[in-house]
Amino acid sequence: MSPTDGSARRDFEKALDIGRPPNIARLFPNSKALIVSGKVIDRAMIAKGGAIAIAANGRNHLVIRGALLAAHRANSPIIIEIAKSEGGANAYCAVNYWNIARQVDALCNELGITVPVAVHADHYGIKSTKDVEAAKVEIPTMFDAGITSIAVDASHLPDDENLLASIALHPLIPPWAGYETEVGEIKGSQGISTVEEALFLIQGLNAHDIFPDWIALNNGTTHGIQDSEAGIQVELTAEIHEALTRYEVSGAQHGTSGNDSDRLRRIAAETRTTKANVATALQMITWGVEVNEYGNARLDENGRFVKRSDQGVTDELWEEMVAYAVEKGWKSGDYKKLNLPFENKLLSQPREIRERMTEGVASFVYSLITEVFNAGNAAPLATEAILEAGSYDLGPKGSRIEDPADWTEERIRGRASSIERDRGPAGDFED
């Protein structure tokens, strides 16, 4: 929906003038795309109440295209994101941290998208001291390339190392940018996050004048294709969010694909979640793989994906993709690795095929926005947040409550040693 009336048009033009962060204004000086900080999206969802913004993982160009069209039709702000495993230095997608903002900006201008869009670096994983040092070089380059929000994910580390890594890297993040932190690596029903460790992370950050916009938890979901009906633990999520109330941090829901609509509606209504990541389902839809209401790809009796001939890529290209995966010895969960070698082949499909790939994503995301996450018609609230602030920088929601003297490195390590934590099984749980 375009801001066609005079007042809405003036608000949009003013937001374009003052609401685009410095990196975006520098990269795209003549753009009509309203690319904003992740903070803007969070504040719009808070203002609407019981609403969650879609964070669409753009594993291919047509996912980004479809998600932006859906947001525009729903008049909803949206987050377009890519994770380190998907789009970092050693990625399995052609879309990456350094080109995603350029794709978003180009598509917004091409398609006439007039809703606010944040560009988020999801799951910037930190697994070692070596990763911290590499991040000190890499993170600034991502903001140079147009990222406007980031999730620093050191949840793979012990609680004290997670906190200390987050503190060490925070000076690299522009103060205007959206910021997400994470506790409890996403592992499904094992290694579930607790109130104690969530408080430890948020209190420690608070003592160092770091005020996250979002916290992600392991609240029962997994990345990729779900193989159980367990899913999100709504009550646990609400309990943790309630414990964090005074720190004014919203929730970020990971592993959304594979959870039924009623459970997702409860997350919107009963918790403080304002961001929900959707990745695997959108990838599958562009390919034409049949997806159920949960966003799970359907498998036949032989464990193979069910491809619909009237959706996604041509049957000929799908057969080529399957043959490539078989040659590599990939199981169903590895099919995500097809994104990089097949991106150009996706883009070289006939126009009518590309359009149905895009429209499949647009239809799915539109339904999530309007029928599940209560985020329809929230775009004016995002614009309003910019105009009220008079700036691209909305500032933090929280303020310092904790005493820094209680959160020195020595005391952080001492506190962490008393936390009882089930880390769950070892292994690679990234997607």
Task: Give short role names for the model-derived ranges.
Residues 39-46, 61-86, 95-102, 106-114, ...:
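Alpha/beta enzyme core
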Residues 304-336:
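Low-complexity, serine/threonine/proline-enriched polar segments
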Residues 57-58, 120-127, 185, 250-259:
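Glycine-rich beta-to-alpha transition loops that act as phosphate-gripper elements at the mouths
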Residues 87-88, 157-158, 282-287:
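Short gly/pro/ser/thr-enriched loop/turn and capping motifs at secondary-structure boundaries
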Residues 204-314:
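Catalytic alpha/beta core domains of metabolic enzymes, predominantly
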Residues 2-26, 324-431:
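C-terminal extensions of enzymes
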Residues 2-96:
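N-terminal capping/small domains of soluble enzymes
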